[in-house]
């Protein structure tokens, strides 16, 4: 199986969730072995997508370099990962990626418009050999050995619209688009005033998030999936796993996970070199199976 990029440049204009300012996003092809590279057009600064460039995970995943930063990148990265894209220039003219509708389906549609093309260099993956876990009290995230990419997530909120939710998802591009991509970010009315006092959630609305009061959901259209809340947690984690730079072969288990825990797991995994191996997907039989995973179903 070969590395992939997009067939042509595509662009979209939106607003950032936390800063609420307009942003112009452009996606452009890059040569093989380039990786995923963010570029702040307004500042002229490139920020390669690497764990060392993560500077904050409080409310979103934020990367930065040379005084430039780009935040709320997880939904965009989730779609890029799901489409198996290895090399891409991600150019923005502001400090936050567009929130779209709070999910990643808009980015999937943008990638469909661009088209996905194979390159000459072989694709690589990080295959888990032994479990790695990161905990924060009762909360934890863990990766385990597996022959497929599988996400087994659970959350628990003391709210009548959420309570306990679990979802088990075997990764493929087609399944991602059907089961995960439309799951929206969510927040609570009682948190909004505090967040806005901190300069956050300024672009949030019922058009780009599930909003909950004390008793239920304020969005008139309701939920897109029965377990939309936990499915969005999977969407976020897939985006955070894109920081590895190559796809993960293993099972990702999470209870009450967060951007912070996802990032700590990535750092811990890369530190424990005996817990994984980098595999080339050149083996014909294995490549055929991986190609099936990244088939879009279009």
From Swiss-Prot:
Zn(2+) binds at residues 75, 232, 236. Its EC number is 3.5.1.108. GO terms for cellular component: membrane. Pfam families: LpxC (PF03331). It is an enzyme of class 3 (hydrolase). InterPro entries: Ribosomal_Su5_D2-typ_SF (IPR020568), UDP-acyl_GlcNac_deAcase (IPR004463), UDP-acyl_GlcNac_deAcase_C (IPR011334), UDP-acyl_N-AcGlcN_deAcase_N (IPR015870). GO terms for biological process: lipid A biosynthetic process. Pathway: Glycolipid biosynthesis; lipid IV(A) biosynthesis; lipid IV(A) from (3R)-3-hydroxytetradecanoyl-[acyl-carrier-protein] and UDP-N-acetyl-alpha-D-glucosamine: step 2/6. Its cofactor is Zn(2+). One of its GO terms (molecular function) is metal ion binding. SUPFAM superfamilies: Ribosomal protein S5 domain 2-like. Keywords: Hydrolase, Lipid A biosynthesis, Lipid biosynthesis, Lipid metabolism, Metal-binding, Zinc. The active site is at 259 (proton donor). It catalyses: a UDP-3-O-[(3R)-3-hydroxyacyl]-N-acetyl-alpha-D-glucosamine + H2O = a UDP-3-O-[(3R)-3-hydroxyacyl]-alpha-D-glucosamine + acetate. Belongs to the LpxC family. Catalyzes the hydrolysis of UDP-3-O-myristoyl-N-acetylglucosamine to form UDP-3-O-myristoylglucosamine and acetate, the committed step in lipid A biosynthesis. This is UDP-3-O-acyl-N-acetylglucosamine deacetylase.
